Curated annotation (Swiss-Prot):
Keywords: Calcium, Cell projection, Cilium, Flagellum, Metal-binding, Repeat. Ca(2+) binds at residues 53, 55, 57, 59. Belongs to the calflagin family. This is Putative flagellar calcium-binding protein. Residues 12-23 have a biased composition (Basic and acidic residues). It comes from Crithidia fasciculata. GO terms for cellular component: motile cilium. Residues 1-23 are annotated as: Disordered. One of its GO terms (molecular function) is calcium ion binding.
Length: 63
């Protein structure tokens, strides 16, 4: 069992976004996720979890 990768990753050549673009993208993700210890963020985390918990088991599954 191994990891299948393209030739571009094997040669070490980076294609696509620059480091600054990737950093900006992650900043956007961080700002969009409810990470603070506030009541509002906690409520948002609960709502997000409910969207992912399709089986209503209190667990995340691969289905």
């Amino acid at each position: 069992m191994g990891c299948i990768s393209s030739k571009s990753t094997q040669t070490g050549k980076k294609e696509g976004k620059t480091a600054a673009e990737r950093k900006a993208a992650w900043e956007g993700i961080r700002h969009g996720l409810p990470r603070r210890k506030t009541a509002e963020d906690k409520a948002r985390r609960i709502e997000l979890f409910k969207k992912f918990d399709k089986n209503n088991t209190g667990k995340l599954s691969m289905e």
